[in-house]
Amino acid sequence: MKMLSDFQAGATVKYHGEPCIVLEHRKDGTLLMVLEQIEHTFGSDNNFAKSDLREHLNGAYMDTLTQGNHGEILKRAIDLTAVNGSKQYGIDTCCIAPLTFDEYRKYHDIIPKPEKWEWSVTPWSTPCVDGDETWVMGLLTSGDGGGSYCTSTYGSRPAFLLPSNYVVEPENALASYTTRELVEELFSRADE
């Protein structure tokens, strides 16, 4: 077991048994992204702050991910600036959200390509610019960006912020032991 601050960006750790990738160490904590996609619709329009996806991620999904320990996850500010620069939706503050399109670009070199198309929180445009409230940007299986209609059902590998001193286990926790050491440990436990 190690503190999150001991892991480099790109490392895989387990949070309550869920494999996550370390994206970045920030002043206010460490940003992680879940590696297993969940599927969900985005919502009735492209504003993440009032979307079905946000409600699900910060409700039932958060209950499961944290095993009821909601206080472990820190709130973070989510920039909902559209691809065309519209700031109509402003900043949303929540605990769990997909990455922004800018964050996908920032972490492109360490994020594995998705198994299926997945949502970002970034709208293509907003109603005040051209009346569009339907298109949301996302990540294709090729790693390229693209847009899709908000009422569709696609994947999400949500991100969340934990205190950097939070203790987690590396995904390959047993990899540091030799086979001999593991077998000896098993035999010593069998003798107890």
Question: PLM features: what roles do these ranges have?
Answer:
Residues 1-173:
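Collagenous Gly-X-Y triple-helix signature in extracellular proteins
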